[in-house]
């Protein structure tokens, strides 16, 4: 019998639990647009009461459609309805004293505030984050701003597009081709990422339990730098060169089958060998140069794919265990059997549009079944009495006292443990001497070098503050030791394919027998069930399967995989699910399984594609470097050369308001073409985009990038130099905020590692306190803590159960 493709929202999760994880927490939402709304949506899903405070005109998101669909009077946009389900709306007119007093009363009753820059109410100094916290010192106040609340750029104009450029994310891991402009990641992803970080920061500050409140300062620039690049500063510091010097398109990558687009990839050397056999060219395996220079093979691979249907390509790739996925978009997403089986998409209770379901699933507690998003000012009277919740223990850092067994590898899983470790948790990173974390070997360090496995820059950046343990749990003695460690841990995080732990007797049901209150986070690529359950998942495949790839690239070419975002985004959402499970355990003493599927997390931040198609029949697609938020918006080549002497310097310009257009005109010297009246409004500029682009390109080509940035910023226009990722460290704003910290490593020396894109007012000190662990560095320490004596530990090493050197499998 066919599985229903969608589910009603009230059926998303069981609804019989007496309390939700965040029951009793009240959050006042003083934000506009996507980032703040997504933050509070995630909190609302967890059971928090969200009171959205709006000026009389309402949040501009109410009338937003990325496809320019007409929102009838009295209705709200479908994206607004998705992001604001289960919230309350209160109108506060800043010009009315009674309303101002009412807002103060509301803030007194709250536990937290989420704030972003916006019109009217939020421009009042008294309603800025410092003013709110000063008047209501019990609150956790989370601010979301382009550059952070302090620093030389804190008041500079920016858009999500220009922030991608500043943070290096517009280049990413050398995305694109050298003969064209770079291409940004479409879909306003930076706003969604900032919203997820804001949710993590808010929950972490609430968990700390300090009675004096806290300011959590989220920087969208730092969020983009964290998630849209691959630790490029640490990479260059350690190895002396950037990961790549030229843009490129992966081969294999996005391929055109006879009836649609598919994504293929080779994340390991073995997968490349298998791919060569699959496409009928085993001779490619004999030429090691082709492994690194595969672009020459692209036409042959394209011809192979073109002779097959999507289903045939995907089936063959699955048979060879080659990472694969269809290229998903808003029109086809809900048609795939895997998503139908898992009921990934749900119907919105207000407008009936398709929405992605929550990005994680919890076994022992519920998420709130969403109720319709509120009309503007729908709740005119609210209870004034603050809800008293159980007193929370006070912690030096948000996760002090939490012990975590980190059974993860590469990026998505270790990212979870890294955030926990930076914020105080005792995180034990588990590897084996025969199968270390694969990211240790990313970077191209020759295996002829001594201790080559200790020189991976990505591992060094992603695992600071952790302790390192090696255990071969394929051996029964190793598996037994894992279980013994679990008895001492609050949390286990793992990101193997589902069958690995299931076959090892280390699944949740087995581990909860030895630790009943265990919180276990499982991070499969596609879920613990469904047709794609056992498919290998790398970041680029998750991007293909979620719509991230579809929105990235030039409209006259195949889409480009962002090639990084799928991993850290999965880690962000797993962290939120984990924090909700911990809140549930704090209330009830009950453990929980958190299923934080990578593709579900990605589908949430690309929700707009499915929503627009379902609600309006609109097909959202990639537009190069243009976008729905601004016109003109594009990259323009500047004068000068890059650090390798190439004519490849670009600036990003985005005019999001009419006022900014007038500023741009002044910066240009008010040339006659720019004074045409049709350009005074967004619609006219959008229609004349080609003409404006040509004029701006000519103006920029005659000027250095820094000169362009200075002129346009002075005129109030969002602008950025397109930064090479490893040059993040040159940004004065990041330097002012201490985004990078120096970390000493016993093998590779001193390098700079990024911190987190949020600052906690009660944790001003450095975040990095220990270098990433050497392989098995803390074996003796940890096994001794477990009660093993030196003779037992020596025997384990002699038998290869533990080790401190990389060895070939026995």
Can you name each region flagged by the protein language model?
Residues 205-242, 326, 330, 581-625, ...:
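Substrate-binding/catalytic subdomain of NAD(P)-dependent oxidoreductase enzymes
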Residues 286-298, 328-337, 353, 675-687, ...:
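Short linear loop/turn motifs
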Residues 319-370, 714-768, 808:
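A glycine-rich dinucleotide-binding beta-alpha-beta segment and adjacent secondary-structure elements
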Residues 57, 146-148, 220-226, 259, ...:
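Glycine-rich beta-alpha junction loops
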């Amino acid at each position: 019998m066919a599985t229903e493709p969608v589910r009603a929202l009230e059926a998303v999760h069981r609804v019989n639990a007496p309390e939700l994880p965040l029951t009793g927490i009240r959050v006042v939402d003083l934000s506009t647009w996507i980032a703040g709304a997504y933050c509070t949506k995630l909190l609302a899903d967890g059971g928090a009461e969200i009171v959205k405070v709006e000026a009389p005109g309402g949040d501009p998101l109410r009338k937003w459609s990325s496809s320019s669909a007409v929102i009838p009077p009295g209705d709200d946009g479908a994206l607004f309805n998705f992001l604001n389900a289960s919230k309350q709306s209160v109108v506060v007119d800043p010009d009315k004293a009674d309303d101002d007093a009412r807002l103060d009363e509301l803030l007194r009753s709250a536990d937290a505030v989420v704030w972003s820059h916006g019109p009217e109410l939020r421009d009042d100094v008294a309603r800025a984050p410092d003013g709110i916290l000063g008047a209501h010192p019990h609150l956790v106040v989370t601010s979301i701003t382009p550059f952070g609340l302090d620093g030389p750029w804190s008041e500079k104009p920016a858009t999500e597009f220009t922030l991608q450029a500043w943070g290096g994310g517009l280049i990413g891991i050398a995305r694109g081709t050298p003969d064209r402009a770079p291409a940004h990641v479409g879909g306003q992803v930076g706003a969604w990422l900032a919203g997820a970080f804001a949710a993590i920061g808010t929950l972490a500050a609430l968990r700390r339990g300090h009675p004096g409140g806290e300011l959590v300062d989220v920087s969208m620039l730092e969020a983009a730098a964290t998630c849209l690049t691959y630790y490029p500063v640490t990479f260059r510091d350690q190895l002396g060169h950037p990961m790549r010097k030229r843009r490129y398109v992966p081969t294999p990558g996005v391929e055109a089958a006879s009836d649609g687009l598919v994504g293929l990839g080779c994340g390991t050397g073995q997968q490349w060998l298998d791919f060569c056999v699959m496409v009928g060219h085993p001779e490619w395996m004999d030429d090691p140069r082709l492994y690194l220079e595969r672009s020459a093979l692209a036409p042959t691979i394209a011809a192979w794919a073109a002779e097959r249907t999507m289903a045939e390509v995907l089936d063959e790739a699955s048979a060879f265990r080659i990472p694969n996925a269809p290229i998903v978009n808003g029109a086809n997403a809900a048609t795939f059997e895997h998503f139908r089986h898992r009921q990934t998409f749900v119907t919105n209770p207000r407008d009936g549009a398709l929405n992605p379901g929550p990005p994680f699933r919890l076994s022992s507690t519920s998420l709130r079944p969403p109720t319709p998003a509120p009309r503007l000012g729908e709740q005119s009277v609210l209870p004034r009495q603050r809800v008293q919740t159980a007193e929370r223990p006070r912690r030096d850092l948000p996760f002090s006292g939490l012990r975590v067994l980190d059974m993860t590898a590469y990026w998505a899983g270790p990212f979870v443990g890294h955030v926990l470790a930076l914020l105080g948790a005792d995180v034990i990173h588990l590897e084996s001497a025969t199968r270390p974390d694969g990211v240790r070997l990313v970077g191209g360090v020759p295996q002829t070098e001594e201790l080559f496995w200790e020189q991976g820059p990505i591992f060094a950046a992603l695992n600071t503050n952790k302790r390192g343990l090696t255990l071969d749990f394929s051996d029964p003695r190793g598996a037994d030791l894992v279980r013994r460690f679990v008895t001492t841990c609050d949390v286990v995080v793992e990101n193997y394919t589902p069958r690995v732990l299931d076959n090892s007797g280390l699944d949740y049901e087995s581990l909860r027998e030895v630790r009943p209150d265990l919180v276990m986070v499982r991070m499969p690529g596609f879920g613990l069930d469904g047709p794609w359950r056992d498919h290998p998942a790398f970041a680029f495949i998750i991007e293909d399967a979620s719509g991230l790839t579809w929105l990235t690239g030039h409209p006259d070419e195949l889409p480009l995989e962002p090639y990084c975002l799928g991993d850290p985004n999965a880690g962000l959402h797993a962290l939120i699910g984990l924090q909700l499970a911990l809140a549930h355990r704090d209330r009830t003493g009950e453990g929980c399984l958190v299923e934080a599927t990578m593709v579900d997390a990605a589908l949430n931040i690309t929700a707009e594609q499915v929503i627009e198609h379902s609600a309006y029949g609109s097909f959202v697609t990639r537009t190069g470097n243009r976008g729905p938020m601004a016109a003109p918006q594009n990259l323009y080549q500047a004068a000068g050369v890059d650090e390798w002497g190439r004519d490849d310097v670009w600036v990003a310009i985005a005019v999001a308001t009419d006022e900014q257009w007038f500023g741009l005109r002044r910066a240009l010297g008010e040339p006659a073409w720019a004074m045409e009246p049709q350009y005074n409004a967004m619609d006219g500029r959008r229609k004349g985009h080609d003409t404006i682009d040509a004029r701006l390109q000519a103006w920029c080509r005659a000027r250095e990038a820094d000169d362009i940035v200075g002129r346009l910023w002075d005129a109030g226009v969002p602008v950025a130099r397109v930064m090479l990722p490893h040059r993040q460290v040159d940004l004065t704003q990041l330097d002012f905020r201490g985004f990078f910290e120096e970390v000493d490593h016993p093998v590779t020396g001193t390098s700079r590692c990024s911190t987190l894109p949020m600052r906690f007012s009660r944790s001003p000190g450095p975040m990095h306190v220990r270098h990433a662990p050497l392989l098995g560095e803390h074996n003796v320490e940890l096994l001794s803590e477990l009660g093993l004596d030196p003779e037992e530990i020596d025997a384990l090493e002699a038998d290869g159960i533990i080790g401190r050197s990389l060895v070939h499998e026995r």
